[in-house]
Amino acid sequence: ETMLGDTAIAVNPKDERFKSIVGKTVIIPIVGRKIKIIEDDYADPEQGTGALKITPAHDFNDYDVGQRNNLEIINIFTEAGKINENAPKEYIGLDRFEARKRILKELKDQEFFVKEENIKNKVPYGDRSNSIIEPFLTEQWFADAEKLSVKAKEVVNSKKTNFFPENWSKTYFQW
């Protein structure tokens, strides 16, 4: 289903098989969006066809490829794991697993599907939910804990804030 957010196809710069098509564009089936064929060392000529679809919003390695090649980042998931408005309308709102099934069917119906193979792949699961974790870009912010700790220590040292029992203040300062 992440093909809905693909923004390039990468081939290895040393792979002579693809030299004549680097820089050209292809159209993503179902989506109809044109994407470029790019060169990037991340593409492994010995793995699969040697050409790799790049989805920067939903794969950590693809994100790095996207940054190196100034690729667009298209997020196709909501925070709840459903397909968002960046996908064709018939997929919007579908659960990611249902979307995957429908996309596969549509690829077969349109005769784009070539073959299916079983491969071993490491898939991350949540510790508590046991759900598959999908890479998902979000806004992040960071605080300077060292600067914040100055005031936090000060209020305990000056007794404006007290711990009961007192020995917990030692634990507080160790943190």
What are these regions (language model features)?
Residues 1-80, 155-175:
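NTP-handling and nucleic-acid-processing catalytic cores
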Residues 18-23, 89-100, 109:
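A glycine-biased structural micro-motif
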Residues 81-86:
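Short acidic beta-strand-loop surface patches of small beta-rich interaction domains
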Residues 95-123:
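Phosphate/diphosphate-binding loops
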Residues 116-122, 137, 166-171:
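Short coil/turn segments at secondary-structure boundaries
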Residues 126:
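Short cysteine-rich clusters marking metal-coordination/redox-active sites
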Residues 142-157:
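Flexible hinge/switch segments at interdomain interfaces of large molecular machines
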